Amino acid sequence: MGRSISLPLVATLTISLTACTSQTIRPEEYSGFLHDYSQLTEKKLPSGKKVLAWVSPTLHTHPYTRVYIEPSLFYPEMLPTERAPQSTLSAVTHYYDTALKHELGKVMTVVETPGPDTLIIRSSIISVAARTQSLRFYEWLPVTLLAAGVSTATGIRDQDSEITTEVAVLDAVDQAVVAQIVRKETGRPLDNDKQVMTLDDFKPVLDGWAFDMRQAYSSGGK
C-alpha cells in the first residue's frame, strides 16, 4: 500500500508557500527611508495595480509644472552578491531614473536643478531578491508534491526575481512631503537558485513603476 501525505503536512506546506508568495509589504519590511509610514493605505492605481501610498490633499492644489528626479539609491546600502553583482545594482538604479524621466517628462518639464513649482522625486530600491515559485495546481498531487519538494531542495525549481521600492515626493521649495509610495513586484522568472539576476529581469517592473507614477499624477492622484 502506498504511503500518503498527511493533511497536516499539506496544510503546513500550503501556509508556508502562501506566505512566501505574497506581494504585500509588511510593516517589518519598511526600510526607514520614508519619514512616516503611518498614513500609508492600500490604493488602486489607474493601471489596476495595488500599492501602499499616501497623497497630500495639497499636491494637486499647487500648479507644479516641473519635476526633479534625484538619483535613486539602494536603502539600506545593498552589497553586491554572486546573484546580484554590482553591475546589476548600478544598472537598476540608472534605468529607474531614466524611466522616471521618460514618463514624467510627458506631463512635466524635467529639470536639472529643483526650484519653484517643482516636485522632487526621491526614490529608493530597498530590496532585490529571488524567491522560489509557489507550487502549481498539478504539483499538489501526492506524487508530484514529493517531486517538487526534491526539486526545491536541490535548487532546480524556478524562482521569481523580486524588487521593492519606496518613493517620497517633495515640494522643492519647502521640502514638504506631498506623496509617498511603497510597492513590491515580481520581475522575470529565473531558471534556478544559481541564475545571476540582470537588469533585464527588472526592466518591465521599472517601466511599470514609472508609467504608473505618470498616470497617477495625471489623474490627480486618485
Say what each PLM segment does.
Residues 80-92, 143-150, 190-194:
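A solvent-exposed, charged loop/short amphipathic helix patch at secondary-structure junctions
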Residues 74-77, 127-131, 185-188:
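Solvent-exposed loop/turn segments at secondary-structure junctions
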Residues 53, 66-73, 118-126, 166-168, ...:
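Soluble periplasmic/extracytoplasmic beta-strand elements of cell-envelope proteins
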Residues 1-9:
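Bacterial N-terminal signal peptides that target proteins for export
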Residues 58-122:
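N-terminal segment of the mature soluble domain
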